[in-house]
Amino acid sequence: MNWQCASYSFDVKMPIVMGILNVTPDSFSDGGEHNTHDAAIAHAKSMIEQGAKIIDVGGESTRPGSAEVSVAEELSRTVEVVRELAQAGICVSIDTRHAEAARACVEAGAAIINDVSGFRDPAMVEVARSCDAGLVVMHMKGEPRTMQDDPVYDDVVVEVRDYLAKRAAELEAAGIAHDRICLDPGPGFGKNASQTMELMRNFHEIARLGYPSMVAVSRKSYIGKAYGIEDPHDRDRASAAEALMACELGAGVVRAHNVEETLKALKDLRPYCYLGLGCNVALVAEPGEEREGKIAQIEHAIGQLCMIPDSQIVDVSSYYESEPAYYLDQEPFVNAVVLMRTGVAPKELLEYLHAIENSLGRVREIENGPRTCDVDILDYQLYVVDNDVLTLPHPRICERDFVVKPLLEISPNHVLADGTPVASVPEDQRVGRAVKL
């Protein structure tokens, strides 16, 4: 998945780090540390040397309770810093909620507009429409001055996800390309500690929307409460751990104060893999309840997937019922796709999957024939192989409706490790037509 930011293009399947450069006197964790021009430039270049791909320049504090500053004051802090960094060949993001400031900084060379207000201002949308900068669309309930005044949600994950989906769709309707948009659920912005924690533990719901997504938890107050760390400067290690967790759930951009600590944590990021599950023989089912029996067997297999060492299920698709493919004289199938993070190598993973199939009575007599449970590796991150034991990506993914639909449900626009888009075969040309249950 690429994030297009003016002349910069980032493949965010492997997370990248955006270094935070606050040129303010009053930011919550580093206000005043880099608010002279020379200090700001030096710190930005240091973060680039440490491995940051983007520098996010902010000239207005958005900490809870902060007062708005004038655009003139904001630009006096930011625009020359943006200009010098951009001229040095650095990808610069401007962290602003003011259209006039965004326009001036884009003209000075900024390649990204990071708007904590989520492009609610029509003037900001017009700035975005008139340039080719990448956009960070954030969720914030209320305004910085009042956002922490008892925020209430019926379901914080659903409300934030749906808000971001709506804002992204509106931006696309305004003429902004899909691949310019990055979504940020806004941890700590109009959310208390427990709400933010719930949101971060369900980050895959944001990733499901099919856009690049950002985790911006660095030194946030919820980390202080969750880990018992009062001083924001002491939260870098915990922040990096939270960022790693979000990246395992699908985040592709990490906004961080401490670039070195963050990249150190991201070394532990496990590859993702997609598994396809299918069943059309129910071992135990009353007449008329065969579908429920098939679902029960797939659920049992998913339970066993949870037991594979150094692995974690990230997401599971809905169940789909599909027509038989290739060998037609058999019962309909129930299918699903599972997204996992795993430290287990593909060949070893295949052995675990065969053991799960065998435990559920899998008999391999007829090619593409009836089965109690089938668990296939569909795609394994950055891994392409074709030998007698294993072929990856699975060679028939794109022609199988019963794989394409559940996979795209959890990972819209997914591109396989060999560069093939999952949706490359039109639906009317696929086999095994599938319907969501």
Region roles according to the model:
Residues 5, 29-38, 42-43, 62-84, ...:
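Active-site-adjacent loop and "lid" segments of alpha/beta metabolic enzymes
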Residues 61-66, 314-341:
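Short, charge-patterned binding micro-sites
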Residues 48-49, 90, 167-180:
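Phosphate/pyrophosphate-binding loops at sites that engage ATP/ADP/AMP, CoA/4′-phosphopantetheine
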Residues 1-14, 45, 270-272:
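SAM-dependent methyltransferases
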Residues 42-58, 249-250:
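Catalytic domains of carbohydrate-active enzymes, especially glycoside hydrolases
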Residues 271-311, 317-321:
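N-terminal beta1-alpha1 ligand-phosphate binding loop
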Residues 325-333, 350, 354-437:
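Flexible, gly/pro- and Lys/Arg-enriched active-site loops
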